[in-house]
């Protein structure tokens, strides 16, 4: 918890506006984590929890989500497995519920809407099978009036560029997105938003300013690949 608080403080110092806390393993620890971070950073940052389907039952998820509500939780992401259980949690809490693992395809989102199983949708380029299919997921969510964010699968620069363009080109993406700041090792560090990487295969790092990643005006995804690094890191 102390390490998480330190990282939250660093995120605030670097201009990050929303932080996501990983939960779903130890329920008591999850409450202590959100409490500790809220006490440390005050009301300045949005805070959300991603349980990755970790709570064993809808009843448990409802209990822990309600316990977190006093700490101004922006949303709870995928607290339980399955759309039916998600619907039960959504009905019984005031905190908005985001669907992630339950929302892979446009058909999934239709079922979520029909069962009122979430208040918002997390979109990926990877889950549905690429940018075009991700835009279909977004279109269904938009038709249903559900806001979205874009999440990533810990991609390096090419995938992050795709996620960045998906977020920037999709009007219903209004919540903070999980897009790490990919940074080649000879270009410095990406700060708290680039901690996943020691290096990257893109030539230039993403431009990061006050918590935002700036979309490149260059053609395509706006990136250039370092061919030497691509060969170096290639798995034969």
Q: Which residues fall in each region the model found?
A:
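Shared catalytic-loop signature of beta/alpha-barrel
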Residues: 66, 72, 81-96, 104-210
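A generic structural signal for well-ordered alpha-helical surface patches
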Residues: 35, 161-164, 219
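Metal-dependent enolase-superfamily TIM-barrel catalytic cores that perform enediolate-based chemistry
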Residues: 1-93
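C-terminal extensions of enzymes
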Residues: 190-236
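Glycine- and other small-residue-rich loops at beta-strand/loop junctions that grip anionic moieties
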Residues: 22-26, 53, 57, 77-79, ...
């Amino acid at each position: 918890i102390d390490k998480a608080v330190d990282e939250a403080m660093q995120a605030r110092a670097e201009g990050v506006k929303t932080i996501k806390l990983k939960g779903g393993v130890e329920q008591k620890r999850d409450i202590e984590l959100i409490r500790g971070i809220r006490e440390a950073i005050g009301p300045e940052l949005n805070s959300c929890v991603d349980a990755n389907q970790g709570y064993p039952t809808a009843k448990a998820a409802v209990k822990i989500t309600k316990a977190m509500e006093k700490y101004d939780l922006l949303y709870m992401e995928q607290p339980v497995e399955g759309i039916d259980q998600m619907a039960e949690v959504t009905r019984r809490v005031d905190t908005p519920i985001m669907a992630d693992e339950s929302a892979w395809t446009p058909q999934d989102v239709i079922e979520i809407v029909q069962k009122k199983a979430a208040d918002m949708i997390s979109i990926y380029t990877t889950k549905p099978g690429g940018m075009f299919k991700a835009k279909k997921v977004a279109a269904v969510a938009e038709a249903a009036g559900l806001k979205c964010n874009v999440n990533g699968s810990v991609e390096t620069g090419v995938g992050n560029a795709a996620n960045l363009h998906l977020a920037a080109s999709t009007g219903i993406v209004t919540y903070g997105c999980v897009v790490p700041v990919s940074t080649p090792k000879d270009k410095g560090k990406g700060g708290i938003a680039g901690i996943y990487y020691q290096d990257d295969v893109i030539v230039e790092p993403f431009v990061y300013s006050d918590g935002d990643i700036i979309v490149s005006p260059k053609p395509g995804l706006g990136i250039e690949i370092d061919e030497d690094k691509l060969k170096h890191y290639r798995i034969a």
